[in-house]
């Protein structure tokens, strides 16, 4: 009897060891779409495309992944190369990322975005689109103090145009930031702004092109070192 129970316990132990567990769940939202990425302990992933009003387009992709430190590569149907940073899984190829909802792994988060709910940051790369910087620019990692500085400079920059007279803060705008250092070692940040009501479901996840919409969409550059703004562009003007 003792041998039987010992064998049973050993069998249950082996069975439990073979059961894969979810270690990361991340998602990207885009208007009426959602992309759900889940990583499992056996180095497999499941990637789902979910369409709210057109379920026939829903798709599930599966494959293997490799995670080394903060670098993530997915193989198979969902081909992805990126890294984990500030509670997001960010692409190396495009200005897009997935927000981590649940995780059993440690990741490097230098910014608490609960303090900055209207901001999101994308890592600069010359190979990505929307490259508004000089050819000598290199990537710079923004800090919480940098975001505070940007937040204080933005209203000043906006009030220099006729479209934003009297603006005291930018709380009603969602801000996407891409930061670099120029050849002089100065920190330059491209800031893409959109009315929060319009962009709330997408601004955290990807940078998209918008060519109209008036003052609900504008962008500019800020030299954090000199605390100056330039290249202000307001859609439709």
Give the positions of each predicted feature.
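Lipid interaction determinants
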Residues: 16-62, 66-68, 73-110
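C-terminal partner/receptor-binding element of secreted or periplasmic proteins
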Residues: 91-108, 213-237
């Amino acid at each position: 009897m003792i041998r039987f129970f010992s064998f049973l316990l050993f069998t249950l132990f082996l069975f439990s060891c073979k059961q894969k567990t979810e270690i990361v769940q991340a998602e990207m939202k885009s208007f009426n779409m959602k992309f759900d990425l889940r990583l499992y302990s056996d180095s497999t992933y499941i990637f789902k495309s979910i369409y709210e009003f057109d379920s026939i387009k829903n798709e599930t992709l599966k494959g293997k992944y490799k995670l080394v430190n903060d670098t993530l590569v997915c193989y198979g149907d969902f081909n992805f190369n990126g890294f984990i940073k500030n509670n997001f899984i960010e692409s190396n190829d495009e200005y897009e990322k997935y927000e981590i909802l649940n995780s059993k792994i440690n990741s490097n988060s230098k910014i608490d975005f609960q303090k900055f709910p209207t901001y999101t940051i994308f890592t600069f790369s010359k190979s990505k689109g929307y490259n508004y910087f000089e050819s000598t620019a290199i990537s710079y990692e923004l800090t919480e103090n940098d975001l505070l500085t940007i937040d204080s400079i933005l209203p000043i920059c906006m009030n220099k145009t006729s479209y934003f007279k009297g603006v005291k803060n930018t709380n009603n705008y969602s801000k996407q930031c891409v930061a670099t250092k120029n050849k002089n070692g100065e920190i330059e940040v491209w800031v893409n702004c959109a009315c929060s009501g319009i962009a709330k479901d997408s601004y955290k996840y990807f940078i998209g092109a918008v060519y109209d919409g008036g003052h609900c969409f504008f962008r500019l550059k800020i030299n954090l070192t000199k605390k100056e703004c330039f290249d202000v562009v307001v859609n439709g003007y």
